[in-house]
């Protein structure tokens, strides 16, 4: 199937009598309720369930193996290839399926808040609530922009269309396929709305580096003086909590680009975790869940329609989608200057990494490629053992290119713009999980404040004898003994053994980066 035929098929779909294009938020909310796709909550948000798929389905994600991209993609478990033939046949079937639907919902908008680098996108949805979701998550066009909007990428989403693995070359009924030549994302068999968000992020992770822009899985904020900070970190490291600062304005909570102009948000909204959400803990997120926002897999009281954020019956991965303007203290448009400070967050359950350390350029590249944190294993028979988790560039499921490409760009930009990089451990202190305790949040905030203010630039440091990290000896508001992790352990020999164990896990994980320069390994990694 040629690109021309693909476009003809799309044109027919978009011009069919069932296509509802660019409905407003109130119109979409009405459609969701009339079609019985979701419920209205007590705060006016729409609540929907995603069925059996309550999270991303990485084994069902494919990139079409096309001549123009075949030698650029880092093929493997993350970027699984699928043939053009399989894609073309499935695409034709999905289009025929959607043509028969009573209604289709179309959103046209953008990915990328910097107008110089934004990608015009359109999303064709089987579900009204999915269309409301993308309306809130991506960047909404003005009426004037809509008149000249020409899509550079189209998502075609048909959650009720199930693939046949024997015929379609998929691994299950669900599929998320990206064709870079045809500029199409094809999604079916899963109702999880996050697949649409992350598909566009994966695409931007391919397109932006081609324009010498580093795409990043991080949150970003800006201070009153215009100083920009980036926060990288995997789930559970405190990224959302620590980047929500009343004294700083939020640029974005999840996906950013770093160009020669500075930093920009890729999205126009937030996709926040809701598990155990309360007004006390996360007032910004709690208050953003209002009319037009979308709740995903959150249990709602049938009578009062009040959301119960502590109920994880459906999943722990409960989510809220809302536009940036639903929260106070933001930058609009979501663009800012070059980062002054970069924070890598890790929740080290082995309790051996310092609570804060300064990183050289090589160490920054090493820890960026490592993307380390801990996940806690199950607590069967009362035994808990933390498991080291490494997610390349703090976002391995979304990186189509070789990881070294992103790391090299980060190194170049750190050097060019003199960004200061810190590794912050929000995990355990005084012993590993089960012995020590979680790092005091107040101390972590004080350390980050000292990093952002420039205070740590002039603070005396000591080199960690196992990880080679420069550890500040004094931070205002933090007891000195907390800064050196070994000092917090009663058993110093046990600390050393545990630290060497983690250092070896870093080294073992790093063996997969064959194309990385020796400098990053020799100057960036553990020294013992």
UniProtKB/Swiss-Prot annotation:
GO terms for biological process: gluconeogenesis. Substrate binds at residues 56, 192, 198, 319. Keywords: ATP-binding, Cytoplasm, Decarboxylase, Gluconeogenesis, Lyase, Manganese, Metal-binding, Nucleotide-binding. Its cofactor is Mn(2+). Pathway: Carbohydrate biosynthesis; gluconeogenesis. Transmembrane segments: none annotated. Mn(2+) binds at residues 198, 217, 254. ATP binds at residues 198, 217, 233-241, 282, 319, 444. Binds 1 Mn(2+) ion per subunit. It comes from the Bacteria. InterPro entries: PEP_carboxykinase_ATP, PEP_carboxykinase_C, PEP_carboxykinase_N, PEPCK_ATP_CS. Its main location: cytoplasm. Its EC number is 4.1.1.49. CDD domains: PEPCK_ATP. Gene3D superfamilies: 3.90.228.20, Phosphoenolpyruvate Carboxykinase, domain 1 (3.40.449.10), Phosphoenolpyruvate Carboxykinase, domain 2 (2.170.8.10). It is found in: Cytoplasm. GO terms for cellular component: cytosol. Belongs to the phosphoenolpyruvate carboxykinase (ATP) family. Involved in the gluconeogenesis. Catalyzes the conversion of oxaloacetate (OAA) to phosphoenolpyruvate (PEP) through direct phosphoryl transfer between the nucleoside triphosphate and OAA. PANTHER family: PHOSPHOENOLPYRUVATE CARBOXYKINASE (ATP) (PTHR30031:SF0), PHOSPHOENOLPYRUVATE CARBOXYKINASE ATP (PTHR30031). This is Phosphoenolpyruvate carboxykinase (ATP).
């Amino acid at each position: 199937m040629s690109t021309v035929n693909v476009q003809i098929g799309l044109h027919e779909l978009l011009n069919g009598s069932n296509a509802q294009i660019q409905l407003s938020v109130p119109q979409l909310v009405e459609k969701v309720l009339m079609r019985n796709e979701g419920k209205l909550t007590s705060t006016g948000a729409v609540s929907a369930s995603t069925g059996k798929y309550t999270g991303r389905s990485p084994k069902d994600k494919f990139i079409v193996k096309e001549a123009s991209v075949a030698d650029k993609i880092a093929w493997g478990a993350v970027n699984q290839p699928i043939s053009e033939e399989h894609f073309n046949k499935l695409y034709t079937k999905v289009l025929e399926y959607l043509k028969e639907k009573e209604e289709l919902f179309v959103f046209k908008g953008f990915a990328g808040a910097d107008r110089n680098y934004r990608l015009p996108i359109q999303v064709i949805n089987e579900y009204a609530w999915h269309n409301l979701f993308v309306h809130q998550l991506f960047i909404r066009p003005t009426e004037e922009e809509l008149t000249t909007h020409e899509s550079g990428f189209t998502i075609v989403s048909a959650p009720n269309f199930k693939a046949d693995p024997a015929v379609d070359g998929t691994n299950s009924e669900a599929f998320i396929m990206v064709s870079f030549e045809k500029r199409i994302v094809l999604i079916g068999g899963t109702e999880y709305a996050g697949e649409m968000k992350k598909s566009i992020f994966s695409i931007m992770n391919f397109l932006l580096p081609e324009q010498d822009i580093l795409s990043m899985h991080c949150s970003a904020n800006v201070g009153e003086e215009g100083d920009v900070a980036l926060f990288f970190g995997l789930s559970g490291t405190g990224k959302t909590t620590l980047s929500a600062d009343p004294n700083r304005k939020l640029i974005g909570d999840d996906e950013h680009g770093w160009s020669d102009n500075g930093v920009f948000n890729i999205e126009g909204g937030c996709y926040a975790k809701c598990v155990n959400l309360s007004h006390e803990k996360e007032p910004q997120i709690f208050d953003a869940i209002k009319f037009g926002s979308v709740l995903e897999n959150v249990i709602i009281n049938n009578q009062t329609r009040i959301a119960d954020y502590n109920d994880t019956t459906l999943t722990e991965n409960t989510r809220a989608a809302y536009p940036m303007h639903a929260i106070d203290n933001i930058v609009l448009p979501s663009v800012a200057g070059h980062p002054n400070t970069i924070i890598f967050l890790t929740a080290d359950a082995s309790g051996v990494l310092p609570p804060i350390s300064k990183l050289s350029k090589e160490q920054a590249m090493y820890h960026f490629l490592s993307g380390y944190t801990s996940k806690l294993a199950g607590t069967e028979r009362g035994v808990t053992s933390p498991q080291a988790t490494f997610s390349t560039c703090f976002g391995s499921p979304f990186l189509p290119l070789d990881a070294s490409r992103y790391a090299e760009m980060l190194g170049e930009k750190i050097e060019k713009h003199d960004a200061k990089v810190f590794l912050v451990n929000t995990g355990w202190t005084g012993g590993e999980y089960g012995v020590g305790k979680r790092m005091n949040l107040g101390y972590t905030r004080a350390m980050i404040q000292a990093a952002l203010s420039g205070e740590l630039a002039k603070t005396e440091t000591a080199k960690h004898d196992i990880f080679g990290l420069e550890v500040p000896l004094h931070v205002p508001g933090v007891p000195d003994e907390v800064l050196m992790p070994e000092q917090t352990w009663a058993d110093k020999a046990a600390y050393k053994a545990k630290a060497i164990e983690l250092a070896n896990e870093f080294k073992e994980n790093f063996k997969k980066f064959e194309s990385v320069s020796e400098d990053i390994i020799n100057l960036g990694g553990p020294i013992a």
